[in-house]
Curated annotation (Swiss-Prot):
<dbReference type="GO" id="GO:0032981">
    <property type="term" value="P:mitochondrial respiratory chain complex I assembly"/>
</dbReference>
<keyword id="KW-0812">Transmembrane</keyword>
<dbReference type="InterPro" id="IPR003918">
    <property type="entry name" value="NADH_UbQ_OxRdtase"/>
</dbReference>
<feature type="transmembrane region" description="Helical">
    <location>
        <begin position="94"/>
        <end position="112"/>
    </location>
</feature>
<comment type="function">
    <text>Core subunit of the mitochondrial membrane respiratory chain NADH dehydrogenase (Complex I) which catalyzes electron transfer from NADH through the respiratory chain, using ubiquinone as an electron acceptor. Essential for the catalytic activity and assembly of complex I.</text>
</comment>
<feature type="transmembrane region" description="Helical">
    <location>
        <begin position="308"/>
        <end position="330"/>
    </location>
</feature>
<keyword id="KW-0813">Transport</keyword>
<keyword id="KW-0472">Membrane</keyword>
<comment type="similarity">
    <text>Belongs to the complex I subunit 4 family.</text>
</comment>
<feature type="transmembrane region" description="Helical">
    <location>
        <begin position="60"/>
        <end position="80"/>
    </location>
</feature>
<keyword id="KW-1278">Translocase</keyword>
<keyword id="KW-0520">NAD</keyword>
<dbReference type="GO" id="GO:0048039">
    <property type="term" value="F:ubiquinone binding"/>
</dbReference>
<feature type="transmembrane region" description="Helical">
    <location>
        <begin position="342"/>
        <end position="362"/>
    </location>
</feature>
<keyword id="KW-0830">Ubiquinone</keyword>
<dbReference type="Pfam" id="PF00361">
    <property type="entry name" value="Proton_antipo_M"/>
</dbReference>
<keyword id="KW-0249">Electron transport</keyword>
Amino acid sequence: MLKIIIPTIMLFPVTWYSNNSMIWINTTSHSLMISLMGLFLLNHPSNNSNNFSLNFFSDPLSSPLLMLTMWLLPLMIMASQYHLAKEPWFRKKSYLSMLITLQTFLIMTFMATELILFYILFEATLIPTLIIITRWGNQTERLNAGMYFLFYTLTGSLPLLVALIYLQNSMGSLNLLTINLWLKELPNSWSTNLLWMACIMAFMVKMPLYGLHLWLPKAHVEAPIAGSMVLAAVLLKLGGYGMMRITMILDPTTKSMAYPFLMLCLWGMIMTSSICLRQTDLKSLIAYSSVSHMALVIVAILVQTPLGFMGATALMIAHGLTSSMLFCLANSNYERIHSRTMLMARGLQTLLPLTATWWLLASLNNLALPPSINLIGELLVTITSFSWSNITVILIGLNMLITALYSLYMLITTQRGKLTYYLHNLNPSLTRENTLMSMHILPLLFLTLNPKIILGPTF
């Protein structure tokens, strides 16, 4: 535990005391070393948890998400270099400090043993994210996006605090490792149903559930590249992780209360996928595709089967890497043509063939081409939902079809077609960008060879 937390905190002096010309290389190499040190977390020989102290532990559910969090920091630093090129050094260092603070909070959130501690850290991740969006976003609408982000997530989270205090008083402890030992079955009553709603709503907003998703496209579109990456790859997964932990405690109630949410997810999944087909803004399209993928994860968790938990974990990791890669590609387009409109970037394949290859790989992963882990996750979710109701297979099949359509639409619109007249003297693709894309795609390829390390505690 400490051999991850202490080097992460040591990134602060590395950032502030580094020579200005060496700041990027120092922080990137240091954070990459931390992510490689964290690989030991993925090894769970007996499927038990690693208990680091009374307050922190890791198990097969949190370990892949921890690894994803640590892997993302060097990638965010690499992706942000162009965005911060004209900023003064103090602001560059402040930006990096925000990213490091966010990483520290996220690592501690995924490792928290007590649910109250988990809640405090879960809320603490809002502050650096909000500062990143509202201070370093590209347009003035970033303030509006920050307000949406803050109020949606805070309003959803307040009932969770009340519910956790109530559970603490009735059970005596909220320690995740021992809670199953004295867990009493909750009575079937209105108060229990309200308790379930209060507990689950914070995570539904964070995921986000269709209907509570309005903050997500705004936050994604207005955030700088690192904000978009961490939001899509890790912060949405906090919702899924929390939902898995909390539904285990509220066990029998979930089975009766989940019906309206399952229907809303299955409906919203198709709606948001259809919205993607109508998008002209590249970042907005990727944001709506995140809502669609997360709806699948909510379905898998609420059905409450071991296969569902496996599918949800696999899909969360796969989506984290894929959507982060798509945001990086959208950002590299934006850096060259200074517009997020897809039609403005058409025909780029002739000028930047290697970038077009990355676009192809990212789009194919997004539409869950075999044998990617995206497909493994989607198949497990499909099997789970089919065991719950046969009709869901039609809806999920339709969603897969629309996902394939908008992924290919995005690829063809941005890469194929006739080159626009003002796109002739573009910068070539940089080694930094190619390294960034390969560091997204390599974990996806390696996980295809051995997916069991990310299939969670029920494998």
